[in-house]
């Protein structure tokens, strides 16, 4: 069968219709009762080296199984060794490992658990170093600096991507070519293709945890953020991808793009929540769902915009008074910004082991990134108040506005310049996630001529047709 015939044998997933949305929802309904594919994987046999295949199946099953919450340090070390052994065998065997996999669900579970254990180990090691209370564990960690090291984890993910040629395959699909022509002997096997694909999502997550938000987005250059992407077929992967992409945009001050990403996945979740409750990942998804509503509340406060009706209603229900306080700005809003950010941000990690001999010099990565974000918030604290005055005038004297705000004119001038610069944001249109066009993010613009402020306001008309269509669909 040719590549064109294989493509035409499947429904057109590029269609943005409600029919496609329902198909995606139905596909997720099938996932809910899926037991991670492990039972099928354990039953799979190879006609060749049966015992070796069964051993690999057992290792894959163990790799996808969550580690106990109260696991000892020795257990965490052993888990790292098991992952190293598994990935070394898959990547460095003579020729591709022959193993028929039941589906793509298990591959996400393996990569997801691998990164989760890396993240939790790094946070645990940092806590031990900062507290300085458990000398025995500190000594063990000091003697094993490379266990769950950042370089080792990144090396595994990049190696799986390179071995599977998955980026080349995705680029070929974008060009309308057959991906098998560039897949090679490894990438044509589902085992390598699935692990390589979800390693890209894993890299997005790891780079975001390390605080490199532009590199996090760069890793997704060959993945299209739409319903036909493979990650959209696995609910946990779908949710994770949009969360980390949206958060990366937010930390890069691209609030419009962040809102777009958060809104997309939150609308999808609202449509599938009735049958999520039976799934194994329901609690994790529900927690991430709440976190994204907190992040979208922050983004809307920093970048006022009109939201989807579903998102707007849920946001008002969850953060009614808090949202109003955020939008009003001022010093009293600072603690609320920090509280929401800490509750919704990823659990950041440090790329290097901590200093066990000097606990005081170790910084909590979450505190570090929170401080960076709060510096940005402080620059925009008075924007709502300034906007409320400027909307009343077409021209206004700088000293007059400074008198209203009870600040020094030069301090107000610096606020206005910062606000002017922040109002110019890059907005994604097409291409890679880092690409975009600079646009004026506010409906209010102004220019300074010495001490005279010239104000212009543009009001976008309401799209009443869309509003009527949405509400007619609800009635009928």
Curated annotation (Swiss-Prot):
PROSITE patterns xrefs: PCI
Record InterPro entries: eIF3l, PCI_dom
A single MF term (Gene Ontology): translation initiation factor activity
Top-level taxon in the UniProt lineage: Eukaryota
Residue stretches making up the PCI domain: 257-452
Compartments where located: Cytoplasm
Family annotation (Pfam families): Paf67 (PF10255)
GO biological process: formation of cytoplasmic translation initiation complex
One cellular component (GO) term of this entry: eukaryotic 43S preinitiation complex
Keyword terms, alphabetized: Cytoplasm, Initiation factor, Protein biosynthesis
Subunit organization: Component of the eukaryotic translation initiation factor 3 (eIF-3) complex.
Function: Component of the eukaryotic translation initiation factor 3 (eIF-3) complex, which is involved in protein synthesis of a specialized repertoire of mRNAs and, together with other initiation factors, stimulates binding of mRNA and methionyl-tRNAi to the 40S ribosome. The eIF-3 complex specifically targets and initiates translation of a subset of mRNAs involved in cell proliferation.
HAMAP family: eIF3l (MF_03011)
Family membership noted in the UniProt record: Belongs to the eIF-3 subunit L family.
Protein name, entry field: Eukaryotic translation initiation factor 3 subunit L
Provenance organism: Aspergillus clavatus (strain ATCC 1007 / CBS 513.65 / DSM 816 / NCTC 3887 / NRRL 1 / QM 1276 / 107)
């Amino acid at each position: 069968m040719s590549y064109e015939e294989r493509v035409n044998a499947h429904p057109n997933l590029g269609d943005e219709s409600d029919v496609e949305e329902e198909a995606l929802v139905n596909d997720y309904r099938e996932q809910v009762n899926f037991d991670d594919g492990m039972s099928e994987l354990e039953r799979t046999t190879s006609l060749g080296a049966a015992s070796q295949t069964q051993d690999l199946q057992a290792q894959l099953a163990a790799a996808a199984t969550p580690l106990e919450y109260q696991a000892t340090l020795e257990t965490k070390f052993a888990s790292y060794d098991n992952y190293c052994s598994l990935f070394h065998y898959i990547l460095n065997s003579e020729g591709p490992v022959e193993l028929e996999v039941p589906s793509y669900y298990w591959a996400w579970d393996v990569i997801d658990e691998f990164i989760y254990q890396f993240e939790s180990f790094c946070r645990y090691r940092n806590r031990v170093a900062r507290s300085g209370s458990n000398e025995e564990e500190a000594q063990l960690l000091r003697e094993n600096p490379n266990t769950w090291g950042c370089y080792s984890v990144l090396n595994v993910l990049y190696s799986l991507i390179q071995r599977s040629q998955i980026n080349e395959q995705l680029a070929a699909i974008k060009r309308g070519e057959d991906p098998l022509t560039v897949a090679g002997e490894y990438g044509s096997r589902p085992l390598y293709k699935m692990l390589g694909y979800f390693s890209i999502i894993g890299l997005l997550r790891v780079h975001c945890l390390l605080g490199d938000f532009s590199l996090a987005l760069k890793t997704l250059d060959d993945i299209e953020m739409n319903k036909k992407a493979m990650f959209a077929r696995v609910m946990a992967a779908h949710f994770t991808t949009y969360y980390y992409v949206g958060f990366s945009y937010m930390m890069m001050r691209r609030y419009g793009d962040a809102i777009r990403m958060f809104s997309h996945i939150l609308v999808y979740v609202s449509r599938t929540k009735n049958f999520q409750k039976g799934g194994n990942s329901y609690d994790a998804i529900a927690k991430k769902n709440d976190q994204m509503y907190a992040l979208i509340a922050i983004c809307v406060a920093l970048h006022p915009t009109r939201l989807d009706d579903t998102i707007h209603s849920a946001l008002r229900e969850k953060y009614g008074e808090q949202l109003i306080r955020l939008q009003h700005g001022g010093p009293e809003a600072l603690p609320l910004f920090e509280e929401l950010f800490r509750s919704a941000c990823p659990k950041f990690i440090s790329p290097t082991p901590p200093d066990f001999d000097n606990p005081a010099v170790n910084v909590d990565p979450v505190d570090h990134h929170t401080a960076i974000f709060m510096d940005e918030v402080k620059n925009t604290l008075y924007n709502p108040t300034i906007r409320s005055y400027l909307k009343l005038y077409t021209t206004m004297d700088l000293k007059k506005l400074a008198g209203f705000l009870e600040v020094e004119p030069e301090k107000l001038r610096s606020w206005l310049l910062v606000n002017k610069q922040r109002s110019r944001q890059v907005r994604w249109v097409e291409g890679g996630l880092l690409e975009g066009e600079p646009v004026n993010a506010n409906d209010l613009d102004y220019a300074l001529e010495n001490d005279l402020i010239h104000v212009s306001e543009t009001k976008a008309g309401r799209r009443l047709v869309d509003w009527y269509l949405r509400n007619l669909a609800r009635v009928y």
